[in-house]
């Protein structure tokens, strides 16, 4: 195989909402109905079908690395559960759906891992937002907005040598009379080593 290059793809998975449902709220009492609308709107985008379509594109191009944006999770849990977010019933997991569909297509990919300090493990994902709120459906809704990098698992000749996850100093905020949400941004950096040509970031 020719290792004179590392092929990289970037893909926005689209979590299914831009949170416009909450942008114009005027009172806190309106918030649960907006959460319900976000929940139903996300599911209406047919996340599993979208993940399958993205998997077909990746399988066709077969890049070594794929950077995923808005690779989000949607979960539900007991109504009015206390902070921090704890809802665990998975309604959508775009990364898991994508990896499952890629496996079906014979194009195995996975998240990357590297050993961190004190026997910890660093994963090639980064959480931008992990928020949970009550809905009018009788349960809490939790949205976890993530970025991730996945890599081919059928190529042992390209090895991971470094993986770093960083935060931006500035944050995005959604603020109105009903709610204030802080969305920190950041990035994931990896270095893959190709035996004949050295590191490729």
Q: PLM features: residue spans?
A:
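Conserved beta strand-loop-helix elements of the APE1-like EEP
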Residues: 100-105, 138-163, 193-196
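Short Pro/Gly-enriched beta-strand edge/turn motifs at strand-loop
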Residues: 130-132, 162-176
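N-terminal, active-site-proximal structural segment of metallo-dependent hydrolase catalytic domains
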Residues: 1-130, 134
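Flexible, glycine-rich surface segments
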Residues: 199-201
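Short consensus segments that form the blades of beta-propeller domains
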Residues: 85-89, 138-141, 179-182
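Residues that flank catalytic or metal-binding motifs in active/ligand-binding sites
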Residues: 4-9, 94, 143-146, 184-189
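A Trp-anchored, charged/polar loop motif used as the substrate-binding/catalytic surface
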Residues: 44-56, 174-193
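Conserved S-adenosyl-L-methionine
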Residues: 109-117, 160-169
């Amino acid at each position: 195989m020719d290792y004179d290059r590392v092929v990289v793809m970037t893909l926005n998975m689209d979590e299914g909402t831009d949170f416009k449902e909450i942008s114009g709220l005027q009172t806190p009492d309106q918030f649960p109905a907006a959460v319900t609308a976000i929940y139903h709107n996300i599911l209406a985008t047919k996340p599993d079908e979208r993940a399958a379509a993205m998997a077909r594109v990746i399988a066709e191009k077969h890049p070594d690395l794929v950077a995923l944006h808005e690779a989000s999770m949607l979960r539900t849990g007991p109504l009015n559960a206390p902070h921090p977010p704890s809802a665990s019933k998975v309604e959508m997991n775009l990364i898991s759906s994508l990896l499952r569909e890629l496996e079906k297509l014979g194009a195995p990919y996975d998240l990357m891992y590297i050993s961190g300090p004190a026997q910890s493990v660093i994963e090639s994902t980064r959480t931008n937002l992990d928020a949970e709120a009550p809905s009018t459906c009788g349960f809490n809704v939790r949205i976890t907005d993530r970025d991730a990098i996945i890599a081919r698992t059928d190529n042992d000749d390209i090895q991971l040598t470094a993986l770093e996850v960083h935060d931006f100093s500035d944050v995005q905020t959604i603020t109105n009379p009903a709610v204030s949400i802080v969305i920190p941004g950041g990035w994931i950096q990896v270095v893959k080593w190709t035996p004949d040509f050295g590191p490729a970031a």
